[in-house]
Amino acid sequence: EATARMNTARRTLHGKLISQMDLRRVDVRNMSEESLRQSTQSLIAEILNNDSSIAPDIDKARLAKDLLNEVVGLGPLEDLLADPSISEIMVNRFDEIYVERKGRLTKVDIAFSTDHAVLGAIERIVAPIGRRIDESSPMVDARLKDGSRVNAVIPPLALKGCNITIRKFSKNKLIDQDMINYGSATKDMMRFLEIAVEQAANIVIS
């Protein structure tokens, strides 16, 4: 329930923040990343101080951080990207996000405020590499600064809403015991592959 209230507050304030930026004619394209962050941070603080509709039990510091990440960063994906235990992130729509940990897929209790916010995150991913995504080109592949692979799909190709899949690169190399622990392979399977490699046999993976 607390998460639902936080998400509702974030959606409401996200709309107000975007409206204020539009009214003030903030041209984000001509601003440095640091200038945009500082300007947005000040505007968020102003909105939070003047908005009496925010429930008293809402963590305003967390709300401000979430709003800032959503406008100038990758929204709720920022914390997921910083989590070393997560190997893959899948956004099926703005409020449906899954992560993979140790080979197991689970739904996380976080969300973007709107589908438009997901699109904004995608645009911030592809803009630095000179790519674009729109209705005429609704799918794009890219990489984050850390090398993580990104695939993004938007309507009309995506039916439920904007999709993002991020495959992170683990700092620790995967070994055969990891595959066994994750349930991806058995000891016999790994031993068979080891023998096949030792014998320089042809291996077909399909």
Please identify what each model-predicted range represents:
Residues 83, 91, 96-201:
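P-loop NTP-binding catalytic core
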Residues 205:
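Hydrophobic anchor at the beta1->P-loop junction of P-loop NTPases
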Residues 1-106:
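N-terminal anchoring/assembly modules that precede and organize ATP-driven motor systems
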